[in-house]
A protein has these predicted regions:
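Flexible catalytic loop/linker elements that gate and position reactive groups at enzyme active sites
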Residues: 187-202, 315-447, 463, 573-581, ...
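Condensing-enzyme catalytic core of the thiolase-fold
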Residues: 1-352, 374, 381, 505, ...
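Flexible, low-complexity segments
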Residues: 308, 479, 516-538, 583-584, ...
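Acyltransferase
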Residues: 172-173, 177-183, 421-422, 497-719, ...
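Helix-rich "cap/lid" substructures immediately adjacent to catalytic or cofactor-binding pockets
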Residues: 58-61, 438-539, 543, 613, ...
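Acyltransferase loading domain of fatty acid and polyketide assembly lines
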Residues: 206-207, 252, 284-287, 316-318, ...
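Flexible, low-complexity inter-domain linkers and amphipathic docking helices that mediate domain-domain
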Residues: 390-393, 416, 682, 787-989
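Short, low-complexity connector segments at domain boundaries
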Residues: 7-26, 370-371, 377-464, 525-526, ...
Length: 989
């Protein structure tokens, strides 16, 4: 309950809770020890090790801090009924003393056991009807309530600087104790008066400057008169009759919530200040006759009334008095009218773009598909009741004030109607053209930008983006300023010419095609950079690699423009002719088919079965005919020249002369080479000869994609004017990889802004981070529904406890029967894919069992074990369970070394494959022993260093063509001799 309330409090403060991880945020929570669950001496298997941390009130604040990753003070306060108000006071002190930068303060009460009802009934402290009739003649005891309340606190200066919506101010407060009074549980009037005066002094206020008091007001015949007299003595005297102190208590509305009572009163008064209304207290048909109400100017709020207007800020006080004698009093003040609204649009966002986003994305996420749908449904209903909220404000608020979980979706629309239709489809699980869905990987993976080559150009490309996004326009204009003097006509006249015009036809001339693509892609990369897309790699195709080189910092913009203009001009000046053909066949087979044919060669290897040949018409036609006869798909490319063939040779010398006149730099962002299919080295990038080879040699795009896949990239984003490379990349990945995503940010003649925003939303759904605030420069933050938690109860079930009885395990509210232990894992006869799937299923089942989930379907394979709530004890149990199921000796830290079910399953599969190899070759068993020792952490640093030296020596001998005698002795050693040697050398037992 408290975790959810803390999360919701942060969301309502427009703070994404995940952004507070590792921050100096404090947690101050009031909580009273509760009796739910067995005692420590009664625990059985399944509960031992969790009773203290799971049942002790002292752990509550720490658990909040642990779950959210907060590193400020975490303090649980138990002063009985005053716990949460004392927590608020301590949190304010910590903020003033710089112990934390933000604080969560509040309290929680859950009465899971009837003991407190029985005890107070024996003391005649409970009202017969369960209602608190505070300060009423009918008062006959208190009435209990349960719940939680949390406040988000920040220093006023920080809150203003961070653009927070400020709901109210804490002017000051005080805490004291009754001391040796007339009974530890009896209220003490003088102590209450002292704490009120101390709080007023701390706040720098006079009693008459406070308009109302939220009283402790429990409804008891002893406590109410004492508290009323304290209020009369402190606040009631010296006031004019037209400015009485208004007194009320929220306990008459909701009951006495124990440790959460104080924060309930604060929440009530903050809302009262915001709405400038003093709410009535219930059940006061007649004021208590045990109080001399004429002793001061005090008025009970028997009816709601407007907050009195004065020339000073409205103020209220809140009292909370613990049964143990700890008293707290806090002074509140209304927020300044300028602070009580959401912050203005950020200067950074406003400077980055002068116009609003033409297409609005609404981003949603959840820990599961049901949560995602529930969030869409809740938002749809919420907005149905709030037609005044602007779509862009919703978009900004979703993007920057809500956490981003694994299951993601985005709704894209130009207006409110279209966006709501998409929300409705998402909530219903239906497909819609403006809804994208995806699952973000548990770990963040690198992003790659793909820069397209010739063939992707189209008339008017970038025109809509130019008008919509000033950053794109500025970058495009900057390129034009450098490249126009090098062209026969201004680039803009060609690129933005109406389709079908003579100028537009020039776009297909190489001399203009290459500069146009360069300008478009540089502008796109600049726009993406503004929106927070920072690529880990760049991969271009032909001229796209030159654009990538500039984006990576290899060439300045003037030098890059000079190279691009020369490249296009020199190619365009070559005699027209030649041909290019795309074949749906592997490179090796195509190479073989070229044997004996002159004037034709491979121009590009775009995938495992995507090869392009280029050269003279006749031999190219022969090759095409050969492959058609074999039933292979053949596509003739519409080109003016046979690029990447010997027909480019006449331009190379002049092109090299231009390249040698430029200044080259090592890449700041890794560029994957078209020539080698691997990352471009600094030596290659700065060598003009490389860029000459890049013109002439085959484009090894498929090899580049394979290299990226092998190096763990997550998402490939194509930034060209048409989706060309995206489809090639998908073909490269289709057979071997389902984890890498491909996104095209433009699709030919589709609306450019719509396609771009949808592409960004799709990338986001795959886990790509963007600075979404920069996409909403004019929007403001608004209230939205909080996260739809998917609650499931795990009650302790069983018969009432007797001496010696066993403790029932915590089980979910399902009808699932207890299952028998499953047989050991048997992978015999399975292929590699089946083995991986079987092991993953095993890990998911055992994880669900250890965590108490109802089934493996509740476990996300790419979600971190830590995020599921797994602690070290559960991690060891998972390791033990999986070791028994697989027969492997897994490390006790396996769940943390391999932090997701998917990575742990991959490790186990690899170990099982190694075990199978060991059965086939027993000499490898010694290595298995060594691997287990390394994983267990039993080797000291000295032993590890000796191990490195010894293994390096072994590898040297293994690679040697003639093993030396010592190596031969080692090769001939038996398993036992090898193990004895390892044991003796490294102390492995």
């Amino acid at each position: 309950m408290l975790l959810e309330t803390c999360w919701e409090a942060l969301e309502r403060s427009r703070i994404d809770p995940t952004t507070l991880r590792a921050s100096h945020t404090g947690v101050y929570m009031g909580a009273i020890s509760q009796d739910y669950g067995p005692s420590m001496g009664e625990a059985t298997e399944g509960l031992e090790g969790y009773l203290v941390t799971g049942g002790a009130a002292s752990v509550i604040s720490g658990r909040v801090a642990y779950t959210l990753g907060l590193e400020g003070p975490a303090v649980t306060v138990d002063t009985a009924c005053s716990s949460s108000l004392v927590s608020l006071h301590l949190a304010c002190q910590a903020l003033r003393q710089q112990e934390c930068s933000l604080a969560l303060a509040g309290g929680v009460t859950v009465m899971a056991d009837p003991g407190i009802f029985v005890e107070f009934s024996r003391q005649r402290g409970l009202a017969a009807d369960g209602r608190c009739k505070a300060f009423s003649a009918a008062a006959d005891g208190t009435g209990w309530a349960e719940g939680a309340g949390v406040l988000v606190l920040e220093r006023l200066s920080d809150a203003r600087r961070n653009g927070r919506r400020i709901l109210g101010l804490v002017r000051g407060g005080a805490v004291n104790q009754d001391g040796a009074s007339n009974g530890i549980t009896a209220p003490n009037g003088p102590s209450q008066e002292r704490v009120i005066r101390q709080a007023l002094e701390a706040a720098g206020l006079e009693p008459a400057e406070v308009d109302a008091v939220e009283a402790h007001g429990t409804g008891t015949t002893l406590g109410d008169p004492i508290e009323a007299q304290a209020l009369l003595s402190t606040y009631g005297r010296g006031r004019s009759t037209d400015s009485p102190l208004r007194v009320g208590t929220v306990k008459s509305n909701i009951g006495h919530s124990g440790a959460a009572a104080g924060v309930a009163g604060v929440i009530k008064m903050v809302e009262a200040l915001r709405h400038r209304t003093l709410p009535r207290s219930l059940h006061i048909d007649e004021p208590s006759p045990h109080v001399d109400w004429s002793d001061g100017t005090v008025r009970l709020l028997r009816e709601s009334e407007p907050w009195p207007r004065t020339e000073r800020p409205a103020r209220a006080a809140v009292s909370s008095f613990g049964i143990s004698g700890t008293n707290a009093h806090v002074l509140l003040e209304e927020a300044d009218s300028d602070d009580a609204v959401w912050g203005e649009p950020s200067e950074e966002g406003a400077a980055a773009s002068a116009v609003a986003l033409p297409e609005v994305p609404w981003l949603l996420s959840g820990h599961g598909r049901e949560a995602l749908r529930d969030q869409a449904r809740g938002l749809y209903e919420w907005l149905g009741d709030a037609p005044e909220i602007e779509p862009a404000d919703v978009g900004l608020s979703l993007a920057v004030t809500r956490a981003r979980f694994e299951h993601r979706a985005a709704v894209v629309g130009r207006d409110r109607r279209e966006l709501l239709e998409g929300l409705d489809a998402l909530a219903s699980g239906e497909l819609a053209s403006n809804v994208v869905r995806g699952t973000a990987a548990g770990d963040r993976h690198p992003v790659v930008l793909l820069l397209t080559g010739q063939g992707s150009q189209r008339a008017g490309m970038g025109g809509e983006l130019y008008d919509a996004f000033p950053a794109f326009a500025a970058a495009f204009d900057e390129v034009r300023a450098h490249i126009d003097p090098l062209l026969d006509r201004p680039l803009g006249e060609v690129v933005f010419a109406p389709e079908g015009s003579l100028e537009a036809e020039s776009l297909d001339r190489t001399g203009y095609t290459q500069p146009a693509l360069f300008a478009f892609e540089v502008a796109m990369c600049r726009l993406l950079r503004q929106w927070g897309v920072v690529p880990s790699y760049l991969l271009g195709h032909s001229i796209g690699e030159v654009a990538a080189a500039h984006v990576a910092g290899v060439l300045s913009l003037p030098d890059a423009c000079a190279l691009v203009a020369a490249r296009g001009r020199l190619m365009d000046a070559l005699p027209e002719g030649g041909a290019m053909v795309a074949l749906q066949a592997p490179e090796e087979a195509v190479t073989a088919s070229l044997s004996g044919r002159d004037g034709v060669g491979i121009a590009a290897v775009n995938g495992p079965r995507a090869t392009v040949v280029s050269g003279d018409h006749a031999p190219v036609a022969e090759v095409a005919r050969h492959w058609r006869d074999q039933g292979v798909r053949v596509s003739e490319l519409r080109v003016s020249h046979a690029f990447h063939s010997y027909r480019m040779d006449p331009m190379l010398k002049e092109f090299q002369r231009v390249a040698e006149g430029l200044t080259w730099h090592a890449p700041e962002i890794p560029v994957v080479s078209n020539v080698t299919g691997e990352v471009l080295t600094a030596q290659e990038a700065t060598d003009p000869e490389y860029w000459v080879r890049q013109v002439r040699e085959a484009v090894r795009f498929g090899d580049g994609v394979r290299w990226l896949r092998e190096n763990g990239v997550g998402t490939l984003m194509e930034v060209g004017p048409h989706a060309v490379l995206a489809s090639m990349a998908m073909e490269c990945l289709a057979e071997t990889d389902t984890s890498t995503g491909v996104v095209a940010l433009q699709h030919g003649d589709h609306p450019e802004t719509r396609t771009l925003v949808t592409g960004l939303a799709e990338a986001h759904s795959r886990g790509v981070d963007l600075d979404w605030a920069s996409l909403f420069p004019t929007a403001e933050r608004v209230d939205l529904p909080t996260y739809p938690f998917q609650r499931q109860h795990y009650w302790l079930t069983g018969q009432p406890r007797t001496s010696g009885a066993t403790v029932p395990e915590a089980r979910p509210d399902t009808d699932t029967e207890t299952t028998e232990p499953e047989p050991p894992l048997d992978l015999s006869g399975m292929g590699p894919a089946e083995r991986e799937e079987a092991v993953l299923d095993l890990v998911l089942r055992h994880t669900a069992r250890v965590l108490g989930y109802s089934g493996p379907e509740e476990v996300e394979e790419n979600r971190g074990f830590m995020d599921t709530g797994m602690d070290s004890l559960a991690g060891v149990r998972l390791r033990t369970s999986l070791s028994q199921a697989t027969g492997l000796e897994l490390s006790t830290t396996a769940a943390f070394d391999y932090p997701t079910p998917a990575t742990l399953a991959g490790h186990i599969t690899q170990r099982l494959d190694g075990a199978a190899s060991t059965e086939a070759d027993p000499s490898l068993s010694g290595l298995d022993r060594l691997e287990s020792a390394l994983e267990s952490g039993s080797l000291g640093e000295a032993a590890r260093e000796r191990l490195r030296e010894r293994l390096n020596a072994l590898l040297t001998r293994l690679d040697a063509t003639q093993p030396d005698p010592k190596g031969a002795d080692l090769d001939n050693a038996t398993d036992d001799e090898l193990l004895d040697l390892i044991d003796k050398e490294f102390g492995i037992s």
